[in-house]
Amino acid sequence: MPQDAPAGLAPGFLVAAPALADPNFNGSLVLMAEHHAQGALGFVVNRPGPITVADVLGGLDAGLRERAEGAGRADDLVLVGGPVQPERLWILFRPGPAAPEEGAVALGAGLALGGSRELLEALVRARDPGPYLLLLGYAGWAPLQVEREVGEGAWVPLPLQGDLVFDVPMEKRWETAVRRLGLDPAGFLVGGGGAEA
């Protein structure tokens, strides 16, 4: 049965219904960063890409790559944040005493988001920056598109919970989100939709 889409989906999560056939979003957990009359913006937080943090940093500065290697972060996979602007780098991190705040937007629940080279460099150079994820690309929705998709049952909204991003292993994030909705992943069936590619 279709449900009414909530007025404000960000900050929060969208949990993809199993019937969502779009290969960019099947089985995905999307962190919604913006939702307004002009559309919506979010990031898939459970889809690893083919490159590592070292690959990204090596293209910027060899010293940054060495710093990431020393911190044990060089082999972390960069996530595919979505199909829009797949070359654009975003940084999702947990703000803390050593994490920079300039150039970032606080989302709530212990999460912040930015996209500048300066922010990335500051996080990598910080003595103890806390957890962070690098994402390439984002998911975008036209005006009223995400509301329609939620109403059709392609996505189920979930309130923002920072631990889903940094304390739950990437391969368990979707299943954990489904269970937090009070649903059984094996029996969770609805249909349709997909963000802009």
Swiss-Prot record:
InterPro entries: AlgH-like. It holds the Pfam family DUF179. Belongs to the UPF0301 (AlgH) family. Transmembrane segments: none annotated. Gene3D superfamilies: VC0467-like (3.40.1740.10). GO terms for cellular component: cytosol. It comes from the Bacteria. SUPFAM superfamilies: VC0467-like (SSF143456). Coiled coil: none annotated. This is UPF0301 protein AnaeK_4073.
